């Protein structure tokens, strides 16, 4: 039997994903700010998305952000403004390209030097966002696993 300590979903999801984004920096991490700390509204809002910190499955996310959207947020401490990640349609379906997101789940048992990859989730999309709600009218989309060489 496994000695497992489980962190209930979705409470951990909020802290680990969106809440930590403003604290992370790197070449492959989209620049992110808490909305209440925003000093000036960027002129190039087409390159940003507006996300509520405490949402799930893309609910409340504004893809095509306007200045009025930002000014209309009543609780800016609960929102982030994040650089938009443009997914390229790299998988070829019979009729056109499909965008892909691959999520990796690692487990880190006590005493292990590093985490171990446990499973992955590959999500295919043709919509503005990745997820069922944004792709229900498209084909060759959905979730699966990805195979890789060991």
Each language-model region and where it sits:
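Domain-scale recognition of functional cores that engage charged ligands
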Residues: 1-150
């Amino acid at each position: 039997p496994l000695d497992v300590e489980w962190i209930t979903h979705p409470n951990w999801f909020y802290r680990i994903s969106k809440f930590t984004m403003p604290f992370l920096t790197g070449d492959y991490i989209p620049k992110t700010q808490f909305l209440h700390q925003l000093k000036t509204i960027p002129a190039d809002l087409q390159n940003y998305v507006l996300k509520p910190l405490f949402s799930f499955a893309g609910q409340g996310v504004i893809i095509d952000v306007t200045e009025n959207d930002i000014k209309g947020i009543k609780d800016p401490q609960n929102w982030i403004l994040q650089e938009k990640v443009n997914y390229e349609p790299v998988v070829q379906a019979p009729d056109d390209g499909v965008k892909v997101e691959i999520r990796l789940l690692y487990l880190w048992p006590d005493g292990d030097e590093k985490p171990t990859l446990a499973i992955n989730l590959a999500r295919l999309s043709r919509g503005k966002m990745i997820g069922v709600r944004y792709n229900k009218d498209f084909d060759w989309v959905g979730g699966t696993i990805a195979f890789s060489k060991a």
